[in-house]
Amino acid sequence: MRINPTTSGPGVSTLGRKNLGRIAQIIGPVLDVAFPPGKMPNIYNALVVKGRDTVGQQINVTCEVQQLLGNNRVRAVAMSATDGLMRGMEVIDTGAPLSVPVGGATLGRIFNVLGEPVDNLGPVDTRTTSPIHRSAPAFIQLDTKLSIFETGIKVVDLLAPYRRGGKIGLFGGAGVGKTVLIMELINNIAKAHGGVSVFGGVGERTREGNDLYMEMKESGVINEQNIAESKVALVYGQMNEPPGARMRVGLTALTMAEYFRDVNEQDVLLFIDNIFRFVQAGSEVSALLGRMPSAVGYQPTLSTEMGSLQERITSTKEGSITSIQAVYVPADDLTDPAPATTFAHLDATTVLSRGLAAKGIYPAVDPLDSTSTMLQPRIVGEEHYETAQRVKQTSQRYKELQDIIAILGLDELSEEDRLTVARARKIERFLSQPFFVAEVFTGSPGKYVGLAETIRGFQLILSGELDGLPEQAFYLVGNIDEATAKAMNFEVESKLKK
């Protein structure tokens, strides 16, 4: 059953009419609360503790019911610090799950897990709210057509295309361009698809969240002059927050995205950075609730928790949520239960390479390591599939020949291999692209390249029609016509120098 957004106030607005309990026990972020007989709150209900601590400071802590213990007690997990709470303090049952603001009012703003703005830009319109716990769309509501989500980024669209309503894993270390790629995707979905984006910062560094916000303002993704014209809503639950907040912040972001899909009927991009921290927070909460740990100390409900989040990310007949999830792999062990459970849900992987970033090729997407279940002839068509396979074969052959080139030099290769290397180097450079959001740093205007143009460009390189052009003509251009124009400019400049 789908729960439709309400148009009343937030879930904690009718506190006066709710039943009251008292804190019986506090263990870190976990509270045991006693209620009168017959007035037990439901699982996932929001509880609010209000009062003053020993030094007179105001306390306002929201918790979520996780277990019914018997003896009229429930166990709840706090969404903020429990400092100053004491046994015997009054607890109010709101009678509903956590509800957060949704709709256009969220764009350009930063929220915490409770849907409260934390950017000092004043209150948010909370007339339309939605509960964070909802069931996934029913089968009959799903859109089962397999269609590609065009991003306008050549390397992604050609070699590891995204599925509309799919889930993509983004792998990459620090400083290889994850943030810039994320911002370009946010920019392109707004311009090409009329869509919006929601960014969920789950358990990552506060500094990174702040840097992302500043860069979004600088690049125009967040419009400071007219905040309603912004293209993204931000929801942060960072590393310093209690595990309850980190476990639920992904659901808060997803709830905002669902409104844009179901009510506004838009295509939505949902970014989750980092999906591993969602699992990690669930593991902490599971231990605090006294559950028996499973493999490698993870929660026994790992697959269920991951599934309940991921199954809500999908295409319906109204719109789509396409999710891009940064995946941290602990100790680079892909068999660890957290990344292994995540992989089961992914439709595509985009792997960023430090080697390509060091060469100055941006976006630094590895053409050989990045994969997609969409790259099949029956989905993308024979022409696209054949072109992508030939690009990969040429790149793979170049990779195999690099050791020989390093030892013996290019002249020792056969004529055929020299030709392969020349074309592979052109392909490598043509996979780079100027980004709209990087204009302020690079000075070169951004380019959106349609899929048909991308395929045509790579076909011309592979066919040998452009063998006479210098490889630097292919670097940081949009479509292939720009590369040929750039080559002609080089020719004119060299003649003038002579």
From Swiss-Prot:
Subcellular location: Plastid, Chloroplast thylakoid membrane
Pfam family, one: ATP-synt_VA_C
Catalytic activity: ATP + H2O + 4 H(+)(in) = ADP + phosphate + 5 H(+)(out)
Spans through the membrane: none
GO biological process, one term: proton motive force-driven mitochondrial ATP synthesis
Alphabetized PROSITE patterns for the sequence: ATPASE_ALPHA_BETA
Name of the top EC class for this enzyme: translocase
UniProt keyword Ion transport, yes or no: yes
SUPFAM superfamilies found in the cross-reference section: C-terminal domain of alpha and beta subunits of F1 ATP synthase (SSF47917), N-terminal domain of alpha and beta subunits of F1 ATP synthase (SSF50615), P-loop containing nucleoside triphosphate hydrolases (SSF52540)
Keywords: ATP synthesis, ATP-binding, CF(1), Chloroplast, Hydrogen ion transport, Ion transport, Membrane, Nucleotide-binding, Plastid, Thylakoid, Translocase, Transport
GO cellular component terms, semicolon-separated: chloroplast thylakoid membrane; mitochondrion; proton-transporting ATP synthase complex
Presence of the UniProt keyword Magnesium in the record: no
InterPro entries: AAA+_ATPase, ATP-synt_VA_C, ATP_synth_F1_bsu, ATPase_a/bsu_AS, ATPase_alpha/beta_chains, ATPase_F1/V1/A1_a/bsu_N, ATPase_F1/V1/A1_a/bsu_N_sf, ATPase_F1/V1/A1_a/bsu_nucl-bd
Main localisation: plastid
Molecular function per GO: ATP binding; ATP hydrolysis activity; proton-transporting ATP synthase activity, rotational mechanism
Family label: Belongs to the ATPase alpha/beta chains family.
PANTHER family in the record: ATP SYNTHASE, ATP SYNTHASE SUBUNIT BETA, MITOCHONDRIAL
Assembly with partners or alone: F-type ATPases have 2 components, CF(1) - the catalytic core - and CF(0) - the membrane proton channel. CF(1) has five subunits: alpha(3), beta(3), gamma(1), delta(1), epsilon(1). CF(0) has four main subunits: a(1), b(1), b'(1) and c(9-12).
Function: Produces ATP from ADP in the presence of a proton gradient across the membrane. The catalytic sites are hosted primarily by the beta subunits.
Protein name: ATP synthase subunit beta, chloroplastic
